[in-house]
């Protein structure tokens, strides 16, 4: 997020959407927090599984950091705060339909599926 190579902004957005639906309203509501955390963990796992499937990765996705996902897709991570590295990212297909936009689509798809199921329960 914010070109830092840390947690993928797409999954952060998916988690934020999930929290809007099932998150707690009061900080002391630990029961709601625990229930939401279970769903967030499930969403994160689904995101990694769907990335593996849609990008035809053979091994497991270990985490959801941007740099790690870049390594999986392009064979290397990029330092996105460096203009030359951003150019290399673009040249590698970073914003092509098989790059970052596809990762964002995976996160949106997984979130939409989960949120749809939650809304049906209401």
Features from the language model and the residues they span:
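Conserved phosphate/anionic-ligand binding catalytic regions in large, soluble enzymes, centered on
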Residues: 1-16
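Amphipathic alpha-helical interface segments
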Residues: 12-21, 31-122
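Active-site-proximal mixed secondary-structure blocks
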Residues: 25-26
């Amino acid at each position: 997020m914010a070109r830092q190579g840390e947690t993928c902004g797409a999954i952060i957005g998916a988690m934020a959407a999930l929290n809007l639906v099932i998150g707690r309203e009061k900080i002391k509501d630990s029961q709601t927090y625990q229930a939401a955390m279970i769903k967030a963990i499930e969403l994160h796992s689904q995101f990694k599984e769907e990335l593996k499937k849609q990008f035809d990765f053979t091994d497991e996705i270990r985490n959801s950091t941007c740099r790690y996902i870049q390594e999986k897709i392009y064979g290397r991570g990029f330092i996105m705060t460096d203009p030359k590295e951003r150019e290399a990212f673009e040249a590698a297909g970073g914003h092509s339909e098989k790059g970052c936009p596809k990762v964002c689509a995976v996160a949106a798809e997984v979130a939409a599926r989960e949120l749809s199921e939650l809304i049906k329960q209401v």
